[in-house]
Regions:
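Cytosolic-side transmembrane-helix boundaries in multi-pass membrane proteins
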Residues: 1-18, 202-209, 283-334
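Short loop segments and helix-boundary regions at transmembrane helix junctions
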Residues: 2-5, 58-63, 84, 102-145, ...
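Transmembrane helix-bundle core of multi-pass membrane transporters
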Residues: 7, 119-183, 210, 232-241, ...
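Structural signal for alpha-helical transmembrane segments and their membrane-water exit/capping regions
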Residues: 16-32, 135-138, 178-185
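Single transmembrane alpha-helix segments in multi-pass membrane proteins
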Residues: 20-86, 110-117, 252, 256-266, ...
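Loop-to-transmembrane alpha-helix initiation sites
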Residues: 42, 119, 163-170, 211, ...
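Helix-loop-helix "hairpin" substructures at the membrane interface of multi-pass membrane proteins
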Residues: 88-93, 97, 103-108, 112, ...
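Transmembrane alpha-helical segments in multi-pass inner-membrane proteins
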Residues: 222, 232-297
C-alpha cells in the first residue's frame, strides 16, 4: 500500500495541500480568498526558485548549503550599488546579481569537482566566507528602504495579469527548469550522474562535471533571488535569509527529491515548497505558536526523509533485479 502511494507522491502531496487549505479556510474564510491565495503563492515564490536550484544539486548527490549566503551577498552588492549609483538600471542589477551568484556557485562546483571535497564541507565553508564578505562590504550596517530607489523596490511588486512580477518569476523559472531537466541532454545527464555512476561512466557522462553544472545553476538562481529578496523586503544586512537554506532543503525532501541523488521531479519540488508555504502562512492564522510551527515542520521533514529512504531501497532492489535478469539473459545466449 505504501509503495503504491510513493509511486504517486506528487498527487498525494497536492491533495494534502488542498485539504490543508480547505480545512483552514473552513475556520478562517479569509484565508481562502483569492487575494490571500495570491499573496501566499507570492510569499513562497523565492522558496520555489531556490528549491529548484537545490533540486539540481541534489540530483547529482550534492547539497548546497551556501544558497542563502549567496543570496544575501548578491543582494547586499546590488543594494549598495543602487544606493551609491541610483542611475544604474534595475535590469542591469538583476543581470549582475545573477552573474555573481553563478560565479559563487562555480567556486563551489570547482572545489567539489576538481578537489574532491564533499559538497557539504565546501558549502558550509563558503557559506561562512560569503557572510563575512557581506560584513566587510557593509561594515555591519544596513541598507534600508529609504536608501533604495523606487524602481529598485517596485519591480517585484508590479502586477501583471493580477499576479506580482515576483510570482511570474517563480512560474518562469519553474517552466524553464522543468523543460531543461526533461528535454535537454544536460538535464537528463544530471539524473544519470546522481542515480547511477556506473551507467554515467559507460555512457560518457562526467559525474563531476555534472555536479559543477548543477552548482553553477544553483548559484545563478540564488543570485537572481538576491535582488528579488532585497527589493521585496526592502532591507539588506549581514543576516538576511540566515538559515533559509534549511527551508530550501526541506522543500526538496518533502517533494520527494532524494538526497541520495538521481530521483525527483520539478512538480514534487513545487509542491514541497507550497506545502511549507501553506504551513508558514496558516499556522499563525489559527493561533499556533512559532515553537509548534517549528516542531510540525521538523516532524514533516523527518517523515519525508523516511519515505524517501524507503523509496530508495525499493529503487535499489529494482536495479539489482534488473541486473540479475540481464546476467541471466547473457548466460542463456552464451
Amino acid at each position: 500500500m505504501l509503495n503504491q502511494l510513493l509511486k504517486h507522491r506528487e498527487a498525494l502531496l497536492g491533495a494534502v495541500i488542498v485539504l490543508m487549505v480547505a480545512a483552514i479556510g473552513s475556520r478562517v474564510p479569509s484565508f481562502i480568498s483569492p487575494g490571500n491565495l495570491v499573496e501566499m503563492f507570492n510569499d513562497t515564490s523565492i522558496l520555489i526558485i531556490l528549491a529548484l536550484g537545490q533540486m539540481m544539486v541534489l540530483l547529482t548527490k550534492g547539497i548546497d548549503l551556501s544558497m542563502a549566503a549567496n543570496l544575501a551577498l548578491t543582494g547586499m552588492i546590488v543594494a549598495l550599488i543602487n544606493f551609491h549609483y541610483p542611475d544604474v538600471p534595475v535590469w542591469a542589477l538583476l543581470i549582475l546579481a545573477s552573474a555573481l551568484g553563478l560565479l559563487m556557485g562555480a567556486i563551489n562546483g570547482l572545489l567539489v569537482w576538481k578537489l574532491g571535497i564533499p559538497a557539504i564541507v565546501v558549502t558550509l565553508g563558503t557559506m561562512s566566507i560569503y557572510r563575512g564578505i557581506i560584513f566587510l562590504l557593509s561594515g555591519g550596517g544596513w541598507v534600508n528602504s529609504n536608501q533604495m530607489g523606487a524602481d529598485f523596490l517596485g519591480l517585484p511588486r508590479a502586477s501583471v495579469l493580477g499576479l506580482p512580477v515576483l510570482s511570474w518569476c517563480a512560474i518562469a523559472v519553474l517552466l524553464l527548469v522543468g523543460y531543461f531537466l526533461r528535454y535537454s541532454r544536460t538535464g537528463r545527464a544530471l539524473y544519470t550522474a546522481g542515480g547511477n555512476a556506473t551507467a554515467a561512466y559507460y555512457t560518457g557522462i562526467n559525474a563531476g562535471k555534472m555536479q559543477f553544472v548543477s552548482f553553477c545553476l544553483s548559484g545563478l538562481l540564488a543570485g537572481f533571488c538576491g535582488y528579488l529578496w532585497i527589493s521585496r523586503f526592502a532591507v539588506a544586512y549581514v543576516d538576511v535569509a540566515n538559515g533559509f537554506e534549511l527551508q530550501v532543503v526541506a522543500a526538496c525532501v518533502i517533494g520527494g527529491i532524494s538526497t541520495m541523488g538521481g530521483t525527483g521531479r520539478v512538480l514534487g519540488c513545487l509542491f514541497g515548497a507550497l506545502f511549507l508555504g501553506v504551513i508558514n502562512n496558516a499556522l499563525p492564522v489559527i493561533g499556533i505558536s512559532p515553537f509548534w510551527q517549528m516542531a510540525i515542520s521538523g516532524t514533516v521533514i523527518v517523515i519525508a526523509v523516511l519515505l524517501n529512504e524507503r523509496g530508495n531501497k525499493r529503487k535499489g532492489r529494482l536495479i539489482l533485479r534488473d541486473a540479475a535478469l540481464a546476467r541471466q539473459k547473457l548466460a542463456v545466449k552464451s
